[in-house]
């Protein structure tokens, strides 16, 4: 499932950092959302507003020309996605990424990786798996959460973590949002690739838009009868064989190990790790699909497996790409390195511009969240912001809490001037104070 960790992510979340160290790349934080990639009221109600401060003020928008996009065959106007509405938290910076579909570009690292994975399944399972890479990222709250067993009160539903278009519609947090629909349509072997959206921190391995792949295979009783195994055991063994082959296809003859884990939508659940560049790296999350999901979609007698992985995380390792922002650059010095569309090309850095650091201290309010801060900073500085990091905090005798954040500005393509940085920082301070209701120090 795309909900299996892999960004996401935690993709929900399922791969961040060129070295993919266990504690820094495959972060556990989004486990319930992601296999990122998330037990069991199945309510379709949306989460309560957790970012009241942001919604208490009319969003400040940069002037943007009216735009009409086609997303998965659906035509969508900007004002249908970005609204001055208390139930909407989608900024222009996110709208600008819709429809770019980096994963469908054959000469882009994400497209190259996607094609390599598709090639593996086409070769190993000829004419079996149906592939989807152009499904609309606008989905219902029900599809995004309820259909994959995310509880109504789970933190992943909050406005602090998810981009809501309105109270019942979101930008998908994971490719698992399409799982139930595809099962209902009768698909039994499918791969889903797409862009997914999550409000997140700012550093070299996190970005609010990333890409996931979900894989599902459904078995009938006839498939395991006579094998001497029950359906769950049969599916689990088939799943491991499939994914071990995929890991070898991408990384070569590496040592592997399976880790038992927990996901709310699979049982049993596993993580696959490989020993690569002298580190154990988590590659993906997977498991045997919960029977409740199958029953809800008309497959009472079936058993299925599912997996999810994050493309950026794997691509950063396979191509030696050090900063997740590079996937979005149009600089020819980056794009030309992948013009042959081949797996295994190692990225050659073309700039070593130094970062510029600016510190900002303020007294926080009870409603303050770091994701809200990062959203404000990114909305002003865009991809010029490299990292937002908490470097100090304390609480005084009156119970007031102060945070000090260090913001690193750096362009991947050019040197930034002092005047430019100072102007950005001034705007950031102004907007943080106004939108987040903090008191600057």
Description of each model-found segment:
Residues 252-441:
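A carboxyl-terminal module marker
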Residues 190-192, 208, 212-235, 245-252, ...:
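Long mid-to-C-terminal scaffolding/interaction modules that assemble large complexes
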Residues 117-125, 183, 243-251, 377-381, ...:
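Hydrophobic, Leu/Ile/Phe/Ala-enriched alpha-helical segments that form helix-helix packing faces
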Residues 105-108, 112, 141, 150-165, ...:
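Prokaryote-biased recognition of long, low-complexity C-terminal linker/tail segments
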Residues 2, 72-73, 99, 111, ...:
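Residue-identity detector for glycine
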Residues 198, 223, 396:
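Surface-exposed, flexible loop/turn segments at secondary-structure boundaries
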Residues 2-212, 217-218, 280-294, 301-303, ...:
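Class II aminoacyl-tRNA synthetase-like tRNA-binding/catalytic domains
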Residues 22, 58-59, 75, 83, ...:
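Context-gated lysine
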